[in-house]
Curated annotation (Swiss-Prot):
It comes from Vibrio parahaemolyticus serotype O3:K6 (strain RIMD 2210633). The gene is proB. The keyword Acyltransferase does not apply. The keyword Kinase applies. PROSITE patterns: GLUTAMATE_5_KINASE (PS00902), PUA (PS50890). This is Glutamate 5-kinase. Keywords: Amino-acid biosynthesis, ATP-binding, Cytoplasm, Kinase, Nucleotide-binding, Proline biosynthesis, Transferase.
Amino acid sequence: MTTNQQNAVVSQPQTVVVKLGTSVLTGGTLALDRAHMVELARQCAELKKQGHSVVMVSSGAIAAGREHLGYPALPNEMASKQLLAAVGQSRLIQTWESLFGIYGIKIGQMLLTRADLDDRERFLNARDTINALVANDIIPIVNENDAVATSEIKVGDNDNLSALVGILCGADKLLLLTDQKGLFTADPRKDPNAELIKEVKTIDDTLRKIAGGSGTTLGTGGMATKLQAADIARRAGIEVIIAAGSAPNVIFDSLSTEPQGTRFLPCSEALENRKRWILAGPAASGDIIIDDGAVNAVVGKGSSLLAKGVIKVSGDFARGEVARVTNSHGKLVARGISAYSSEDLAKITGKHSKDIISILGHDYGSEVIHRDDLVVIQE
């Protein structure tokens, strides 16, 4: 590390979530690259030495399981992936434990599923655990519990999980390490004229189109899912960096004034804790489709959502559950806790608030989703 690099790094203690994809941990091979993993551990140790806190989200369980079993020929199905994850998770955590042990650092394993984030109480318990580990100078190493979770072994699992972990621990920065140098104007593997995008202030449809599709054979994430994760994290006030895991000092440089890769600036107004949970925690159980007037009121004025602006309801959700709010073209506008079940809401779509009680026979308030329970997604 050069003197200039040291001078460029922020001195104020920060919490950094480091997400390591399978391609980074294997170097594109079929086995864990322990030589590179020890270098990543060294960089995390250097951050801690400087007074910063580190939380790691580590993929690689399936790759570790495949290696330990001698690369068996298994059917490409969920049960095979869960088998490999069950065998490999212990191997992965043992590897990290031995590597961090070189630097005198203790680690703690946390395996999460969507259910741990859907429920508000379990979400808070997970938050307390991860914060307790950090407070006791232990690096939490988080992974999805792929051995039992069926919906998580899909594109975007640990990318999105890392954003949620960032919200759990109140991170200042989220570092998504991959096999690419960052987000480019086109796929650099196909277009020699592709240019690295150094800084992103707003994530729009153009960027989503650039990000494209899926990941590698061993991993499940691609650039599109990293963009999803970046969007979630930055809305919670977390700065996000997508960079190459093979780049020298990439983890330490994440705290510099000019980090490597693509830097996503956080939204200017960070969400309060309850809204962070609405954004990150529960999976939406259905969609509430609203008209243009309601979109303008919710997005432009920060208003609550009224039944008058609802066009249609899809899915099945109970009162108090989270629903997606979309415009008439299906574009996501917001997420929020519905005061009415999907069954009740279907009966009062397009109706004035004063008519709700006469239609339903009961009334949970004039708002379908109160603005305090609503997180705007559209910018």
